Amino acid sequence: MMIDQNKIIGQEKNALLTHFNLDDVDKLVISLKKIGRENFDKVCILIKINKRIVFFHAGTQTTNENNLWIHKKANVVDKFDHSSLFEKAIYEENPDKFYINNGLSRRDYAIVGGGFPIGLESTGIIGSLIVSGLTDTEDHDLAYQALIDIQSQQS
């Protein structure tokens, strides 16, 4: 199944916020709980602002493996300012090229969905929202839908 790069770029642009700071973190968590519903216990969630960890949630049905995936997905978003699913789409036909072309290790980076940039309309990418525990596209969609939800509260 081909992943649509243009759709993902569109999602990243659509999810831009007017503002996001420490006061907004709780609102994002509430959105994640509301949208994730019964899946909230199945996921780990990491929120970063300027590469600083400002929130972490480990669902009751998660393990340390989810923490490892969170770290790898976060590294992709931090390095490329795009969602980890976008990077997966670029290298879908040859994932090894991602690691070779960028001199990166599979130990520290993973091109699977679930890492999503937090961006502002005025300044660009200022953080990341990382989800791990569902399928990679479900992780991506949960992050995207939660950002769209708090965006709707800002307008």
Swiss-Prot record:
- Its signal peptide is none
Similarity remark? Belongs to the UPF0303 family.
* Name listed for the protein in its UniProt record: UPF0303 protein lp_3613
Q: Which organism is it from?
A: Lactiplantibacillus plantarum (strain ATCC BAA-793 / NCIMB 8826 / WCFS1)
What is this organism's lineage?
A: Bacteria, Bacillati, Bacillota, Bacilli, Lactobacillales
